Amino acid sequence: MCTGSTGSLIPSVSDSANSVRRGNLSLCSVLLSWLICAMCLWNDARESLVNVRIANYVFDFAVLWTLLARVLGPPGRPVLQQHHPVQLPVPTEPSVFVKLCNQRVRL
């Protein structure tokens, strides 16, 4: 899921560009940053606070990357979408579920 075309855990630049368009890299970035953060916190007991600072920087980058992917969105979609209430069409004939229920009631 998070591997690039080279098979490594870090995607290549072309993979990153394609994934941002599809919005897949945001989830991958967050998962990788949480993994790195957890590893750094685990090592913190044995080492120094530098690991935690690095993990925080990686996590901040992943959050910003996620927001950027959300704003850009997939291609062909406007950057800022207006959210209008959805007008559902009024059904002119009963649904399949209603028809099946009516048949069972008659039996």
Curated annotation (Swiss-Prot):
Subcellular location: Host membrane
Membrane topology listed for this record: Single-pass membrane protein
Highest taxon, organism lineage: Viruses
The protein's name: Uncharacterized protein ORF21
Species in which this protein is naturally found: Fowl adenovirus A serotype 1 (strain CELO / Phelps) (FAdV-1)
Keywords: Host membrane, Membrane, Transmembrane, Transmembrane helix
Spans traversing the lipid bilayer: 25-42
GO cellular component terms attached to this protein's record: host cell membrane; membrane
